[in-house]
Amino acid sequence: CSNLSTCVLSAYWRNLNNFHRFSGMGFGPETP
């Protein structure tokens, strides 16, 4: 990662996506 904040946000959104997906809800932008 070249930008730390972008990396943190990417990891944050991935975790949030996984949590909501586990709850049966899709949320947040898709991050690679």
UniProtKB/Swiss-Prot annotation:
Single Gene Ontology MF annotation: hormone activity
Subcellular location: Secreted
Top-level division of the source organism's lineage: Eukaryota
Family to which the UniProt record says this protein belongs: Belongs to the calcitonin family.
Main location as per UniProt: secreted
Annotated gene: CALCA
GO CC entries: extracellular region
InterPro entries per record: Calcitonin, Calcitonin_CS, Calcitonin_peptide-like
Protein's recorded name: Calcitonin
This protein's UniProt keywords: Amidation, Disulfide bond, Hormone, Secreted
Cysteine disulfide links: C1-C7
Modified residues (Proline amide): P32
